């Protein structure tokens, strides 16, 4: 490809709407252009990166026994109603009607579609296990699309679905996919961590892991242990319990706390530590109100609470709903005297003996509250977010936190969808059984953005070799120098003949402009054909990553660059 013919409109200024570095650089370097909020055109450079990522994904899926197909983007409402997700999915589901007023949706995911397909075409144990995948556009009506390709309304994903006879078969398929994902992200040149995760809206009762590309700009937070292999996202993370016996109980007392509504205000007013207070919260779980208690220095984990309750929808109660429970409203909520709604508490709360809690009266709190004596709970369970420094649940070493970008997730669905859509097979005895399912997603377009978040510098993108739009850029310093142009053309053609993806910058631009664009676009290897060609018979080779430079003879440069490419392709980042 010649740069004079390449459609890659670059920008010198950072677009105002671009908040994160990947969005800024993808726009500036001419990889994407905005069509509408959360929807993008992929220009030739961007498409080349996507194709490279998809090629790696396809190779690993095929090697693991996957078969590629393509499912429709428009899905009928009937199968979503059968699974129960038509109403549960909420406003993020793009819904539409055809001219006959029949309901459809634009697919955010394909569990229903693939289950319906397999149900109607696979019936025998002899056909299992079966692994089917596709790579296609997905749609999600994000309230506020942001961060470019990180959170858009249209995005590209690979989904593989496994169908097995039993849980043992599912586990085997799951581990195959887990290893395939490790291979994919290593081959893409990314530093990542697989972490334990909550299955979320996709559901299922089995395990789930997210694959997180480590980056300071990541939306997600992960908890991990350096001393062992434990890692989880914050929704799933646990720590080793640290409950210590409290002081001997004292009689509960009510004290005036006028206008002191927050934990910080109450602690300052009563001269107590946040760890000595009970944080009381009321939630609406589907149609019911519930109360959740954690220690005052902790943060509630709504995912853990939702899983404990088994509800479909969970949200914080409004002030009006809080006043249905307590005349004091949200600022003076407490568990003592509450009988109308169920109370759930974190184990740390139940170990307290002289706690401060709201008195359920305006301007008042209780001191010396003793759980079990002054109030009872329906259940005790881990309800809080883990903090850095707490002991690892596996080995006890201090936990650490890092930020990451989710680029893939694997799920053990079990029989959630096969049961809802009656996807069964006949076993060796002729008995009907539900297929046991797993699903495995890779965010292809998100992986492109995540790679930039992890691989950039002040000058632009620093693509890993395996997913770069081109492997080599050949730059003649002066288009007016016939010898330079002839040598650059010859090197370009020789590299192409050797199977190296090469871009020739044949534009009549100043050398400084060419070099600036080269750094912005981020092609891993740059060959500069300049004045040293005439004087010494050599060209300059520069690596985008690290900036290492060396000279090579015109005759040897192609072989040396090929060796460099092999070396970078084989390099494995530390996960």
Curated annotation (Swiss-Prot):
Hydrolase found in the keyword field: no
Gene Ontology BP annotations: prolyl-tRNA aminoacylation
PROSITE patterns linked: AA_TRNA_LIGASE_II (PS50862)
Intracellular or extracellular location(s): Cytoplasm
Catalytic function, reaction form: tRNA(Pro) + L-proline + ATP = L-prolyl-tRNA(Pro) + AMP + diphosphate
Record's keyword terms, sorted: Aminoacyl-tRNA synthetase, ATP-binding, Cytoplasm, Ligase, Nucleotide-binding, Protein biosynthesis
GO CC terms, sorted: cytosol
Gene3D superfamilies on file: Anticodon-binding domain, Bira Bifunctional Protein, Domain 2
Protein name: Proline--tRNA ligase
This protein's domain notes: Consists of three domains: the N-terminal catalytic domain, the editing domain and the C-terminal anticodon-binding domain.
Quaternary structure and partners: Homodimer.
Pfam families, sorted: HGTP_anticodon, tRNA-synt_2b, tRNA_edit
EC code(s) of this entry: 6.1.1.15
Function (record text): Catalyzes the attachment of proline to tRNA(Pro) in a two-step reaction: proline is first activated by ATP to form Pro-AMP and then transferred to the acceptor end of tRNA(Pro). As ProRS can inadvertently accommodate and process non-cognate amino acids such as alanine and cysteine, to avoid such errors it has two additional distinct editing activities against alanine. One activity is designated as 'pretransfer' editing and involves the tRNA(Pro)-independent hydrolysis of activated Ala-AMP.
